[in-house]
C-alpha cells in the first residue's frame, strides 16, 4: 500500500503586486522544488505560491509528476472517503504563500449562494461556484485593511477629511451622521440593522463617485497628507477621536497613491480598519468581508475558490455594483477580526522540544474546510508527533531544516519544501538543523481538513 506522504511541486503566480525576484518568499519557496527550467528572475514579481488541487495552478507529486488532484481522485483513502464525497474529490482548501510588495485590490469573496449565481452569469470573471472564507497568518510584518471600522471612526473621518466629505456629498455625509448619532456602539439588533443600512448608503455613494471627482479629491487628499502629516485626518478639538498614528496614515496614503494614483481606494481606506500583524498573528475573513492587503509575506488558507469581487487598487475588472450589494456592512474594531491561536492538543513533543520551548499552535476558524497548525521546533532533535487526522493535510516549511516521517517513509525538509499527508496517518517532524537556538528553528505550517466535531458547519455556517 502506498505510504500517504507526497512531496509536492507547487506553482507560483507573477501578479504585478508581488515582491520582486529573490525578495519574494513565494518565489524562494517555489524554487525549492521547481522544474529544472525554473529560475527566479531578478526583476520579475512573484506573488502567490499555490498548494492544492485548484485547476488554475495545481500542485504535482515530485516523484511521478502527476497532479495531486489525479492522485487523490484515484485513491479516495488519501483524503478519506468522507472528505472526498463531501468536496467532490477535490481538496477542500487552497493553501498559499503571498509576498506583497504593493496593495492588492479592495475586494470581497462571495458567499456560496452568490458565488453560484455569479459563476453562472459570468464564468470568465467568476471561475468558481464556491464560497471563499480565508485566514491570513503573517510570516513577516504585514499591513492590510480588514472590515468596516467602528462607526464613530467613520464619522470622525467624514468631519476631519474634507476631500472625503466632498466626494461623498455633504448631504449624504450629514444624513449618515444623523442616522447613527448616539447609536454608534448599540447592541440593539434593530438599531444595528438601521446602522448597516445607513453605512451601505454612505459607502455605495462613495463607490459610485465620478472619476473626475475622485481625481480632484485625491489630489487634495495627498496634498494634505504631504503638507501636514502630524495633523492628518485630525480635528482641532477632537482628542478622543483623532487617530493616534496620523503621520503613519498620511505616509500610507502617499504610498498607496504612488502605487495607484487617484484611486477610489484612497478614500475606502477611511472606511476600513487598518491592521498590522506581527509574525504569527492572524485574522479570519468571512465570505462577504471587505479587505485589502497592503504589504508583507503571509500564509493564507481558504476554501478552494478563486472568486474575487474587486472595486479599487486594481487594473483588473471592477464590479462595484456587486461589491456594494453583497457586503454585510458589519462593523467592528480590528481586534474582533483577529484570530487568536491556541495550543494544538493533538501533538506530542519530545523532551528536546519541551526543554527548548517548542510549540504547536492551532489557528481554527469557525468553518469546516480548514484549520492550520504552526509548529516551531527550537533545537536540534526536537520532535513533534501529530496524531492521525480523519482528513488530508498539506505542510510547508518556512524556515530551518528537518525531516518528516509517515509510516516507514522519511524525507528531508528544507525551507520551501511542501508535502501532502494523507488521512489517518501519524506524522512526525524533527529539527535536524545546526547552530545556536535563535538561528536553529524549524518552522512548519500545516493546513488540514478534519470534519470531526465540525459536521454541523454545513456550507461554512
Curated annotation (Swiss-Prot):
EC number: 5.3.1.8
Pathway assigned in UniProt: Nucleotide-sugar biosynthesis; GDP-alpha-D-mannose biosynthesis; alpha-D-mannose 1-phosphate from D-fructose 6-phosphate: step 1/2
Active-site residues, Swiss-Prot/TrEMBL: 310
Record localization: Cytoplasm
Binding-site positions, Zn(2+): 107, 109, 134, 291
Gene Ontology biological process terms in this record: carbohydrate metabolic process; cell wall mannoprotein biosynthetic process; GDP-mannose biosynthetic process; protein glycosylation
Entry-linked Pfam families: PMI_typeI_C, PMI_typeI_cat, PMI_typeI_hel
Keyword Metal-binding carried by entry: yes
Superkingdom in the source lineage: Eukaryota
Role noted for this protein: Involved in the synthesis of the GDP-mannose and dolichol-phosphate-mannose required for a number of critical mannosyl transfer reactions.
Record family assignment: Belongs to the mannose-6-phosphate isomerase type 1 family.
Protein's recorded name: Mannose-6-phosphate isomerase
Lineage, top ranks: Eukaryota, Fungi, Dikarya, Ascomycota, Pezizomycotina
Gene it is expressed from: manA
Amino acid at each position: 500500500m502506498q505510504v500517504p506522504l507526497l512531496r509536492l511541486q507547487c506553482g507560483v503566480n507573477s501578479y504585478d503586486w508581488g515582491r520582486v525576484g529573490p525578495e519574494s518568499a513565494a518565489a524562494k519557496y517555489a524554487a525549492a522544488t521547481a522544474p529544472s527550467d525554473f529560475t527566479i528572475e531578478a526583476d520579475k514579481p512573484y506573488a502567490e505560491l499555490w498548494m492544492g488541487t485548484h485547476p488554475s495552478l495545481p500542485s504535482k507529486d515530485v516523484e511521478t509528476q502527476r497532479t495531486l488532484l489525479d492522485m487523490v481522485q484515484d485513491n479516495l483513502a488519501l483524503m478519506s472517503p468522507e472528505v472526498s464525497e463531501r468536496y467532490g474529490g477535490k481538496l477542500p482548501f487552497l493553501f498559499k504563500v503571498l509576498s506583497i510588495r504593493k496593495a492588492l485590490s479592495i475586494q470581497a469573496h462571495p458567499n456560496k449562494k452568490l458565488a453560484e449565481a455569479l459563476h453562472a452569469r459570468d464564468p470568465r470573471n467568476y471561475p468558481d461556484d464556491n464560497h471563499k472564507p480565508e485566514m491570513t497568518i503573517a510570516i513577516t510584518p504585514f499591513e492590510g485593511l480588514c472590515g468596516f471600522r467602528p462607526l464613530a471612526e467613520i464619522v470622525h473621518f467624514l468631519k476631519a477629511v474634507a476631500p472625503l466629505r466632498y466626494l461623498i456629498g455633504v448631504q449624504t455625509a450629514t444624513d449618515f451622521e444623523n442616522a447613527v448619532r448616539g447609536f454608534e456602539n448599540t447592541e440593539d439588533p434593530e438599531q444595528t440593522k438601521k446602522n448597516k443600512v445607513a453605512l451601505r448608503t454612505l459607502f455605495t455613494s462613495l463607490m459610485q463617485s465620478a472619476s473626475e471627482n475622485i481625481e480632484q479629491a485625491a489630489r487634495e487628499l495627498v496634498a494634505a497628507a504631504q503638507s501636514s502629516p502630524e495633523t492628518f485626518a485630525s480635528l482641532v478639538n477632537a482628542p478622543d477621536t483623532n487617530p493616534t498614528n496620523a503621520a503613519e496614515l498620511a505616509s500610507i496614503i502617499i504610498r498607496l497613491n504612488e502605487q495607484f494614483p487617484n484611486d477610489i481606494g484612497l478614500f475606502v481606506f477611511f472606511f476600513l480598519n487598518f491592521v498590522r500583524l506581527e509574525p504569527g498573528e492572524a485574522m479570519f475573513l468571512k465570505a462577504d468581508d471587505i479587505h485589502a492587503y497592503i504589504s508583507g509575506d503571509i500564509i493564507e488558507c481558504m476554501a478552494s475558490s478563486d472568486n474575487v469581487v474587486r472595486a479599487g487598487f486594481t487594473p483588473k475588472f471592477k464590479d462595484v455594483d456587486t461589491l456594494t450589494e453583497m457586503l454585510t456592512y458589519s462593523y467592528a474594531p480590528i481586534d474582533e477580526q483577529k484570530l487568536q491561536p491556541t495550543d494544538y492538543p493533538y501533538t506530542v513533543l519530545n523532551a528536546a522540544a519541551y526543554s527548548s520551548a517548542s510549540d504547536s499552535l492551532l489557528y481554527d476558524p469557525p468553518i469546516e474546510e480548514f484549520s492550520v497548525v504552526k509548529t516551531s521546533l527550537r533545537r536540534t532533535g526536537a520532535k513533534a508527533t501529530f496524531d492521525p487526522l480523519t482528513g488530508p493535510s498539506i505542510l510547508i516549511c518556512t524556515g530551518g531544516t528537518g525531516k518528516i516521517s509517515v509510516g516507514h517513509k522519511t524525507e528531508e525538509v528544507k525551507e520551501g519544501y511542501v508535502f501532502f499527508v494523507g488521512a489517518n496517518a501519524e506524522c512526525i517532524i524533527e529539527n535536524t538543523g545546526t547552530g545556536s537556538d535563535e538561528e536553529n528553528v524549524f518552522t512548519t505550517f500545516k493546513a488540514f481538513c478534519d470534519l470531526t466535531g465540525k459536521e454541523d458547519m454545513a456550507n461554512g455556517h
